[in-house]
Amino acid sequence: MGITGMVYVVTMVFLLIVLILSSSTVGYDYFQFTQQYQLAVCNSNRTPCKDPPDKLFTVHGLWPSSMAGPDPSNCPIRNIRKREKLLEPQLAIIWPNVFDRTKNKLFWDKEWMKHGTCGYPTIDNENHYFETVIKMYISKKQNVSRILSKAKIEPDGKKRALLDIENAIRNGADNKKPKLKCQKKGTTTELVEITLCSDKSGEHFIDCPHPFEPISPHYCPTNNIKY
């Protein structure tokens, strides 16, 4: 190998090291705990869901996020402790793959690799990631369906005002603003997702930043939101 070739190899190795180091230092400022309404998710899918959807909000994911963006993803794994099988029956209930429940594990693995790996040090390892989600949804009562139900907002297909939905969620989230995602199907706007946001420690609710803009297909209008 000539001098030119050696210089090229050294340069490429250096750039690779820089890339690895930069990817491992991508930070996050807060967590998004996003739950999806199964019925609306299946309505949005071109291929019918393999199983009948429940009229429930279940977990989409817990995502370390950046105020300034972009959000971190696919970060280096620092501590190896695989997901314990004893967690899986609970995860199957609160965190199903709505499109195909026979592929729950693939869904969980994807969420861990893309998002959970970036939650260090708050999220220590894979098992801790899933334990944290179970705790948030059940022990910390961040189940969006129950929060709405307490405010007498049930999944009966009625059309709701945005403010009524937001206020109901605020009552269960220390008066912090959630992030709502909607979709338009024909002339009907459906509520698809609700996100609760917490600080970097995952212990304290914060107002969710970055709401969908009016030009977004996921923007929720002030009235006539079907749930």
Swiss-Prot record:
Record: residues binding RNA: 36, 60, 97-98, 107, 110-111, 114-115
Reaction catalyzed: a ribonucleotidyl-ribonucleotide-RNA + H2O = a 3'-end 3'-phospho-ribonucleotide-RNA + a 5'-end dephospho-ribonucleoside-RNA + H(+)
Posttranslational modification: N-glycan at Asn-45 consists of disaccharide (GlcNAc-GlcNAc). N-linked core structure at Asn-143 contains xylose.
One Gene Ontology molecular-function label: RNA binding
List of glycosylated residues: 45, 143
Signal sequence bounds: 1-27
Enzyme Commission (EC) number: 4.6.1.19
Annotated InterPro entries: Ribonuclease_T2_eukaryotic (IPR033697), RNase_T2-like (IPR001568), RNase_T2-like_sf (IPR036430), RNase_T2_His_AS_1 (IPR018188)
Free-text function comment from the UniProt entry: Self-incompatibility (SI) is the inherited ability of a flowering plant to prevent self-fertilization by discriminating between self and non-self pollen during pollination. In many species, self-incompatibility is controlled by the single, multiallelic locus S.
Family classification: Belongs to the RNase T2 family.
Catalytic center residues: 60, 111, 115
GO biological process, one term: RNA catabolic process
Keywords: Disulfide bond, Endonuclease, Glycoprotein, Hydrolase, Lyase, Nuclease, Signal
Protein name, per record: Ribonuclease S-5
Disulfide bond entries: 42-49, 75-118, 182-220, 197-208
Lineage, uppermost ranks: Eukaryota, Viridiplantae, Streptophyta, Embryophyta, Tracheophyta
Coiled-coil stretches noted in the UniProt entry, renumbered to this chain: none
Organism: Pyrus pyrifolia (Chinese pear)
One GO CC term, this protein: extracellular region
Keyword Nuclease assigned: yes
